[in-house]
Amino acid sequence: MAPTTTASRRIDLSDPPEPYLSFWRERRVCTLTTLRPDGTPHVVPVGVTYDPEAKVARVLARRTSRKVAHVLAAADAEGPGARVAVCQFEGRNWATLEGLARIRTEPAEIAEAERRYEERYGRRPSPNPDRVLIEISLTKALGKV
């Protein structure tokens, strides 16, 4: 388990501290928050991978899921992407990544996301022809780890 600090804080996306990175490498269920068309939050459990070098978080999803529909609707309305957040916690430790999401359908991008998922969660996702990638370009990181 990652060492604990005493204060929550904004994390520098250009230079996240090792305890924060370690916390994102550990296996745990996360949440993804998207916004419904009426602006209310839709929060669902997901697996997330974090690529600090690219400043990207990735979530695999089914093409027909509500989270994908929310991202598509918001991205169309807002331009470059839908505002989303992914979060994970254990005890008093927590980490949140915020950013702009878009849906990726390219097989190579999905395969890379599956590889990263397997690396973090220890198993390859089962085959799914309806799989898409929610790719989040990160704008903010917060946490207490």
Could you describe each region identified by the protein language model?
Residues A2-T34:
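Short, conserved active-site entrance elements at the starts or edges of catalytic domains
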Residues L21-S22, C87, R124-S126:
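Short secondary-structure boundary/capping segments
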Residues A2-D15, G91-V145:
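Charged, gly/pro-rich active-site loop segments
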Residues Y20, R28, K55, N93, ...:
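A generic secondary-structure signal marking the coil-to-beta-strand transition
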Residues R27-R63, V84-C87, L97:
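Short beta-strand segments
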